[in-house]
């Protein structure tokens, strides 16, 4: 019994020891918690608020922890207010800076565009000035060239006029000096006076002959230089240029026109000089009349040089068009003849093996090749370019055809009995047959 009572006492003592003892700090915390609960319940029950007791207000105001929390919240609010104020102050500043940046960009763009416009205007003005200068130079060069040609043509005329004008004066002086000797005996004139009167006219004739010889030599030199340049150009251009025996015919025609005019003027002056030779029994009237005729002829020739410029240009354009057409036709015929040559060469290669067995066939083929005229369009072109007569060659400004082509002579001798139309038809038919054979061979090769 005693042991049971002791155990019960020990258990009660242990429970008493285990129970917490309320300290004054714990009591203050419990009061603060109760007050906080009342405040929370007051805030949550706003439609029907529960009033907070005055004791709770006093306990919360006296608690340091609550004061520190409230101070911290106030600091946060103040910081938020400061941040909002700074943002509000920065907004107009940012707007102002943006406007300034936009204005600066617009001004820079305008300045750049103005600079570009100035540069382009300067470049255009420089280009226009250069173009004007080039056009002026071209016009000056053309005027110089145009002025040099009539000057070159008129210089010998002026010289001849001066000489012709000097000659009558000398003749008049000679007549005046020798007039008393002729008056008593006009039927038997003095031989010395005749020699003196003939000497100026002979000097004029000699000068005219010398000038004509110099001009002929210059023309020959120019023609030789032109022929040498044409040969060099033909060698550079290759075999196709060989089909054109006169590649610079238009240039020769232009040159020939001026040369023919110069020849006409020279002939007029020569005839005038020959007529200016006074026979023994003529007087001053014939000299004056001849001088007037010479002046009229030279003036008409110089006018014709200037008036005929437009007609010459038109004729030159027509000649160029005709020459271009003939050149195109020659190219076409040259292609056809080249094909014919290739075909004949292939036939010859194929028929080399058969020639030993059948010599008559080789003879026939050679005769047909000669008859069909597979020699290229050189002779045809030469026929087309050859002037029809001596007058045409003189009008075109070309020298008269002195040397003939030996190939043309042989062809004319060999084909004297044949008509040209029959030969052309035969050659065309042969070319067509050969082309058909080549086409069949190509088709067979493609199929094979």
UniProtKB/Swiss-Prot annotation:
The modification Phosphoserine is found at residues 197, 258, 288, 311, 324, 362, 389, 393, 415, 429. The modification Methionine sulfoxide is found at residue 363. InterPro entries: Chromogranin_AB (IPR001819), Chromogranin_CS (IPR018054), Granin (IPR001990). It is found in: Cytoplasmic vesicle, Secretory vesicle; Cytoplasmic vesicle, Secretory vesicle, Neuronal dense core vesicle; Secreted. Pfam families: Granin. Residues 1-18 form the signal peptide. O-glycosylated; contains chondroitin sulfate (CS). CS attachment is pH-dependent, being observed at mildly acidic conditions of pH 5 but not at neutral pH, and promotes self-assembly in vitro. GO terms for biological process: defense response to bacterium; defense response to Gram-negative bacterium; defense response to Gram-positive bacterium; endocrine process; mast cell activation; mast cell chemotaxis; mast cell degranulation; negative regulation of catecholamine secretion. Residues 129-139, 158-175, 205-222, 310-350, 405-422 have a biased composition (Basic and acidic residues). Highly expressed in adrenal medulla and pituitary gland. Weaker expression detected in cerebrum, cerebellum, spinal cord, liver, thyroid gland, striated muscle, lung, spleen, kidney, parotid gland, and sublingual gland. The keyword Metal-binding does not apply. Disulfide bonds join 35-56. GO terms for cellular component: chromaffin granule; extracellular space; neuronal dense core vesicle; secretory granule; transport vesicle. The keyword Disulfide bond applies. Residues 223-238 have a biased composition (Acidic residues). The modification Glycine amide is found at residue 308. Glycans are attached at residue 415. Self-interacts; self-assembly is promoted in vitro by chondroitin sulfate attachment which occurs at mildly acidic pH conditions. Interacts with SCG3. Interacts with ITPR1 in the secretory granules. This is Chromogranin-A. The lineage of its organism: Eukaryota, Metazoa, Chordata, Craniata, Vertebrata.
